[in-house]
Amino acid sequence: GTFRLKGDEARESVSKALEVGFRHIDTAQFYGNEAQVGDAIKTSGLDRSELFVTTKVWYESLGDDHFIPSVHESLEKLKLEYVDLLLIHWPYPGNDISLESYLGNLAKAKELGLTRHIGVSNFTIDLLDKAEKVIGKGEIYTNQIEIHPFMQNKKVVEACKEKGIKATAYMPFAVGKVMKDETLLRIAQNHDATPAQVVLAWMEKRHIYAIPSSTSKVHLAENLAYGGVHLTDSELALIDDLDNGDRIVNPDFAPDWD
């Protein structure tokens, strides 16, 4: 993940992530770092087929006049011919642009070969139902939503599973809050692991895909090594119990959450 990373920091962080073995890079038009992400990809020397690159269309670009040109602009900055996954970053907050219209534009981007897969972000269950009706079942690759131990978004995650849509977690570490939580620290100690590794292992058990972010090469490598952490059923239950609906991302244009 590259949210909040700008300029050289974004470029260096992605370079470090690729060096330690990450192959999925997540960016967005709104992050203002697509060009730096593109630089890091180019200088990595990695074959395009090895990478999975995601970007997102900002809600101000969802209209017919802006949607496809904005994707072309993203690709130009990323120095790529296509992305692997293109997401609607947020559902359009007003009534000026209909869901049918911008999801139609998303499907068109796929038809044009600008992306291999399409998906959504910050969609509620109701919006997912509507989206399936517009672009068809099986077309939505993922719904990227806020998920961490303190905000588990269980209803939406369950709806995604039922629909065969991957639930992807942004902010999996709750902006560092997981590193200080006593329960997670205790479980981490049991496994000679970091709280971040514990959270990633828990997410995998719950069939949630995560996009962790770090500027530290050490932490990036640790995050990638979470597979060695095997949580017990009682530890998984303890983490499940940390859920208190503590949402971090809630802008004024957000939908009515589930």
Set out the residue ranges of the language-model regions.
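N-terminal binding-site loop/beta-alpha segment at the start of enzyme catalytic domains
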Residues: 1-51, 81, 105, 238, ...
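Acidic-and-aromatic substrate-binding clefts and catalytic sites of carbohydrate-active enzymes
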Residues: 4-8, 28-36, 60-65, 93-97, ...
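Short, acidic/polar
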Residues: 6-17, 63-78, 99, 128-129, ...
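A structural motif
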Residues: 22, 80-83, 115, 140
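Short, well-ordered amphipathic alpha-helices
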Residues: 37-42, 71-75, 106, 128-132
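A short, structured active-site edge motif that brings together acidic residues
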Residues: 48-62, 82-91, 146-147
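CE4/NodB-like, metal-dependent polysaccharide N-deacetylase domain
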Residues: 67-88, 108-112, 134
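Beta/alpha (TIM)-barrel catalytic core signal, keyed to glycine-rich beta->alpha loops juxtaposed to Asp/Glu
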Residues: 91-258
